[in-house]
Amino acid sequence: MESLSLPVLNPLLASGSNLFRNQHSRMTSSMVSSLKSPIGGTSLSTVRRFGVGVVRMQAVDEDIDLKQMRDIAAAKKRWDGLLREGKVKLLTPREAGYAISLSNKPLLDVRPSSERNKAWIKGSTWVPIFDNDDNLDAGTLSKKVTSFAMGGWWSGAPTLSFNRLFLSKVEEKFPKDSELIVACQKGLRSLAACELLYNAGYENLFWVQGGLESAQDEDLVTEGVQPLKLAGIGGFSEFLGWTDQQRAQAAKEGWGYRLVYTARLFGVVLAADALFVGAQQLGHYIQELRGH
């Protein structure tokens, strides 16, 4: 378990965090440039000390980004090694479906609850390696606000935290000589789970390449309120139907499916227009009140 190094809980949050740091660096550098000449009672030595402090903050941010990149690269290298050396066997979604239906191999679903609750494989066992972080402490709230501001409102990607009970929960359900098919939505978290399980003594592991999202309708027997391909989307992009998964679904479903999202788009445009007109009218009303 200690060999797994996953500093980033989800890719969107990582990209949002980097964007935030870049904006922070630009803002602080502009502050330094504006303080090059002393203003009021501020001494030149104070400005220089402040500038040095900002430079150090930027250096720390860059070091964090570099460490994250190195850790991710190292993790991918380890995961590739597991597959290359045959320690974890690779299955396509169709092969996984055959193994489940013909050989009764268990499927371990390691997706977070936000994805699992939408669609799942019939008869699968659910133990998330990362799950939605519902804590209300200051650190978690800060992460959620940052994630939302940096694109979470559009993609609907939740804030996730590592499930420290993952291994113990799996060990409760499956002996270590079990043949386990491990799957997630896109394939990355399930590889991380395979590494944890292999290091814990599970040696008959099968990884679903591309995740459940890459499965065709006939590959696996599913249950839930949505198609399996749509379980990983969310946010405003899902509401408008502007995701690759929904476009692929629309190509199969036809115009009736597209009409729903077209109507939603028109509704959003009309609502935005009404808000704009209402704001203008309110502004005129306030000006008239001030004139009297």
Curated annotation (Swiss-Prot):
Keywords: Chloroplast, Plastid, Transit peptide. GO terms for cellular component: chloroplast; cytosol. CDD domains: RHOD (cd00158). It comes from the Eukaryota. Residues 101-224 form the Rhodanese domain. SUPFAM superfamilies: Rhodanese/Cell cycle control phosphatase. InterPro entries: Rhodanese-like_dom (IPR001763), Rhodanese-like_dom_sf (IPR036873), STR11-like (IPR044664). Coiled coil: none annotated. The active site is at 184 (cysteine persulfide intermediate). Its main location: plastid. It is found in: Plastid, Chloroplast. Residues 1-56 form a transit peptide. This is Rhodanese-like domain-containing protein 11, chloroplastic. It comes from Arabidopsis thaliana.
